Amino acid sequence: LGANKLVDITKNLDPANMQNLGGGKLVDIAKTLPPDAMKDLGGAKLVDMTKTMDPTNIAALGSDKAADIAKNLNDDNFKDLGGNKVATMAKVMGGDTLKEIGSEKAKGMAKAMEKDDIQTLASDQIVGLASGIDSKQITDLGSDKLVTMVDKIDVDDVKSLGTDSLSSMMSGVQGTQIADLKDDKKVSIVDNLGANFFNADKASLD
């Protein structure tokens, strides 16, 4: 049929049509569309498609195709999709892919998720998402989400965040929240924080 024709047809499906088609059929359509055709379809239509899919359908998309969808969504699209579905996409994409989708998209996904949604992610998925967000912007997520992410990351994975991401996340977490973290997590955080976090940079030559 060709990608262009498939885009034309899909653009003319409303949510009720999609519901009638079913998630499995929409997965087949999504898998057939190359990245540029996804872009042509537009974020709002991709949201309608993804909303119609259940977790099994989204898993059937595979990591790369789920990422293709995410790359064509903006903050409003992610919000419209809802935290539960965004978390499902994040799980299918996995940590490595989340890290590569671009800061704006990773941040959009994190903003759309509530704390409960973040808690359903695995440690490596949170590391990928967090380290994929520009370290200067990650504090925009707010202290509650940041501490939820830090809490869910395994002690052994803290190092994988990198000092910039870890420092920025911790600067956005409140002191009272740090107190509630497990002791081994606190030790790992201090162990992996960069010198900048401890203001050692003020003693530098510049």
Language model regions located:
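General marker for long, soluble alpha-helical cores
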Residues: 1-206
